[in-house]
Amino acid sequence: YDMHFFGFQDDNCAVGLVLAMAKAMKDSGYQPENDIVFCLHGAEEWGASYSQFDWTVGAWEMINHVHPEWVGKTLAFINFELPAYEFDTYTTTYSAPEMFAMLDYFANDYAYAPKPEGCFADGVLTEGYQTYTYSDDFSYYAAGVPSTVNGFLLQKDMETVFPFYIDYYHTQYDNPDTYNEAVMRFNIAYYGALAMYIDQMPATDLDFTAQAARLTAAMDENVMAQAGADVEAYKAALTALEEAATAMRAKVVEVNRAYETAREAGDDAAMAQLRETGRALTSQNLEAFRYAQKHLLGLMYERPIVPHEAPQETITLCEAIIECLEDGDPATAVDEYAWTVNNVLEWYAMYFSPEVIAVQDDMNWGADNQDNLYWGTDINFDKADVDAATRSLYVRYDDKGGDFTEEIAIYEKAIEVEKAKLAAKATAETEAMQALAALLK
């Protein structure tokens, strides 16, 4: 029921895929090692008023209020969006970073992974693509459940949307004319096989070296040091996490590969022993996964980040703006930097009144609205207070060579506030990495 116009690809085809996969497993007589739940969530497009996080509400309610006990027990949530459309010559899977290695092995080395036929001529790319917030899997991911979704939104650069989103998305043109049977057949087979692979392997394959790589990529050592963060302690915690994660992954791979060998040989006794060993590793890894998302996953509104990236990014942008203003160049400041502050929320400050922005801010950060944030609960960033300067620069766009003392003062004050935030978040992340490494040992 939750769709725009026909909603054929988005998301009736996904509903059809889930039901077809359930029927195929049932008709084939497949006996899973674990419970496999087929779940269709409502309120995916919209489900709340006066909230900046008003989509994927049904999924958030399911994992947080209806079945919170699934966290720590669920091996994976496999989600689907627009699954019967050929977006390009390749396809991908978006996921939690900890699942990148498992998805790469499944697509490229696992003997029973289906290959595309009649679609996706360049195959399944497995460079590692972090899930975004535009689908139900993010609600599960943020809650601590390993999650995936077929690559439906962004091209492989993970910045540019597919043309579908310009031509058809949320319009009456998302209709049965877009259907590609070969794509649908492939997605049913591929993700059905992935579900069975995850179900059958004794140890859930989560690779926390990818989490360490994510944290490393998010570091700007110069800005962090400038803010007073203990960069050396942060890097030491990263090293400890990488070591613990590498050792844990080696255990998981050893158990799972041995299980595959025993299965091919029909060695039931070895399989039973490996499953027992894998069960303990799975429990340990799922707890570590939950902890990692609780402490190391943040948002800049709808963009997933490492928490310290928000103040780090703001400091960098504010410094660039100040440099432009000291050169008397407001046009460059506006065109290249000012509108991008606060994850482009400052663009709205340029074009809407302070009263409108106050409502938007209240929806995000108002004390009385914190129980209305859904998948943004406890992980949204703190906005930098630069609206007045943003608005002023937009008005003074053509004032080349002018005096921007007042605007510079606003950005300088913001930098000092953001430095304190950055130092605090770096400390919290250092402690979280240390705790995560301990969970993996």
Ranges and model annotations:
Residues 1-441:
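Secretory-pathway/membrane protein signature
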